[in-house]
């Protein structure tokens, strides 16, 4: 059985944007996961969210298109969200009260459950509150 981590859009955005406050952490976290033999799988929605965030919120269209081209080239391991994941994500989302946590975060969480992933590649503390493990910060 493979060792798995599920990637969130914020991890991917941090890797792509050298000015992101989590850029160095993202580099270290992804290197740590890969060196430990983990595969990082992204829900297809996380790829879409990262592309949108880079283009719209961060005004980095070149980075958005870079991620898109990498997706097209098959550079990412992708888990396409099925009905079960989406339904469970909608149930998890109903329990959230913070406006910072979106349905996309719930999809990442439920993808991690579905795949029995050990880690989530993200910097969002909400996942810790939901009982998931993030990559250790002291690596």
Q: PLM features: what roles do these ranges have?
A:
Residues 36-40, 75-77, 116-118:
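Short active-site oxyanion
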Residues 1-42, 56-66, 139:
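Short, well-structured N-terminal submotif of metal-dependent ribonuclease cores
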Residues 1-4, 109-110, 114-139:
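Acidic, PIN/NYN-like endoribonuclease modules and their adjacent C-terminal/linker elements
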């Amino acid at each position: 059985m493979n060792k798995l981590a599920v990637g969130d859009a914020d991890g991917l955005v941090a890797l792509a944007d050298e000015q992101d406050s989590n850029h160095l952490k993202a580099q270290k976290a992804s290197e740590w996961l890969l060196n430990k033999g983990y595969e990082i799988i992204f829900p297809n929605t996380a790829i879409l969210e990262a592309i949108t965030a880079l283009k719209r919120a961060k005004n980095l269209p070149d980075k958005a298109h870079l991620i898109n081209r990498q997706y097209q080239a098959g550079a990412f391991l992708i888990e396409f969200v099925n009905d079960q994941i989406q339904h469970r994500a909608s149930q998890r989302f109903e329990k959230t009260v913070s406006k910072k946590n979106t349905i996309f975060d719930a999809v990442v969480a439920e993808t991690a459950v579905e795949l029995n992933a050990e880690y989530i590649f993200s910097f969002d503390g909400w996942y810790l509150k939901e009982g998931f493990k993030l990559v250790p910060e002291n690596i």
